[in-house]
Amino acid sequence: XYAFGINGTXRI
């Protein structure tokens, strides 16, 4: 999945 943080970075 993927999650968007406050900075808008996606983490797999």
From Swiss-Prot:
The keyword Hydrolase applies. It comes from Ochromonas danica (Golden alga). One of its GO terms (molecular function) is inorganic diphosphate phosphatase activity. Monomer. Belongs to the PPase family. Disulfide bonds: none annotated. This is Inorganic pyrophosphatase. Keywords: Hydrolase. It is an enzyme of class 3 (hydrolase). It comes from the Eukaryota. It catalyses: diphosphate + H2O = 2 phosphate + H(+). Its EC number is 3.6.1.1. The lineage of its organism: Eukaryota, Sar, Stramenopiles, Ochrophyta, Chrysophyceae.
